[in-house]
Amino acid sequence: MTLPVLIAILLTLNLCQCGRFGCPTRVQIKPCLCNEKSRGLDISCENAKVDQLREALASVAQTKQAIWYLKLRNNHLGTLPAHLMVGLDVRHLIALHCNLSSVDELAFSSIADKLETLDLAQNSFERVPSHAMENLTALVSLNLNYNRLEILHAEAFKGLQSLLRLSLYGNRIKFIDNLAFVGVGRNLTRINLGANQLTAVPSRPLRNLSQLQRLQLHENHIEALLPEEFAIMGGESLDVLDLANNRVQTLPPRAFMSLQVLNSLDLERNLISTIHIHAFQGIEDSLEWLKLGVNRLEEIPSQSLRNLSRLRQLDLRGNNISKVREDDFTPYGKNLKFIYLQNNWLTTVDPIAFVSLDSLEWLHLQSNQLNTFPYETYTPILNTLQVFDIHDNPIHCDCKIAWLRDWVQNKGASVVKLAQETKCETPEDFQNLPLAEISNDQLICVAKASIHYAAIFVQVFSTTAWFLLS
């Protein structure tokens, strides 16, 4: 074998090492790193200048290998330049913390029909780089989280015909043009607009997105929910609606009437004190997951929930509810599997409150003011419960609680959560002792009659002693 042939073989091996997707040598792509994945190369470049990136990526291009991930992190670029990715076959591009505020119109020209994911989060964009993205016909996911966007202009996502997921979380968006989503493909199924500055549901901009399934509007400044807003939007495919952490005070009648396939509704951490009896009209046969935690409710809104025949989860944690009434879960409770009532002010549970809960698996009653757990109240649900949490309640430990102590040590051992934190508050001898550590013969009840006669005896004894000593 001649020397020139040997050198050529060595150079070839250097550029395209063994394995289906061979990485260039570390020296060739410094300061980038390369790892081989089953579907292509994983290239990561950090703390690099533009010229260094051009040189490194040019070396990668010579391998003719597919790049599954190209990750650019902490590179001070300002602008994503043109022709940086010439000759590359990139499927997923991530450019985080690169101080990007713009993208050259030719930046994606060589990968426009290949790029499936574009992540430009944690940069400095004040405007969606629409023109640069217009030809990304294969793009499925776009992430612009944590930038400085204040408005979404008309046709902001024009040309993104394959887009399924769009995330705009953590910007400063106050205004969305009614034509913002014109030109985007009708396949868009998920939009995250959380942690912005919206004051109303952006129904008109969203009205033509007929395939939208998940809409996240949490952590905004929305104060009212109007039925006409969702009617304008359409929402015939909307499955998940997240409105948590807003400023909603009341749920009006037929608020979600047009969202007839809505399966999950999150309204936790608002200011809700009133729910109209017909608030959920129109979604009775679809709603399964409902979060109303950390609001200002003073009772379980049973009249409003009564027709939710498919409801599986009811989350009412962190409200001002003081009692569970006998019909609070009637008749909709038959399919309920998860009930969250922790961090309320519960002092009373009606003896027949849980009778209709045939499918209940999780019951959270921790951090309330319950001092007793009568057997007859909880026996209807003991066979189905998988999680039962009652810690941080002022439990009075006497004979009436003996059944619970036995259950915790036997069948309920895997069901009762934080058993060692489920402690007695009274009587004083048992204060702060875990219920499970108290024996049955210690759990006694003093009859009221005995207490009455003991008091009479003390009074008579005291009177007699006074006469004898006087």
Regions found by a protein language model. Give the residues of each.
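Extracellular leucine-rich repeat
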Residues: 2-470
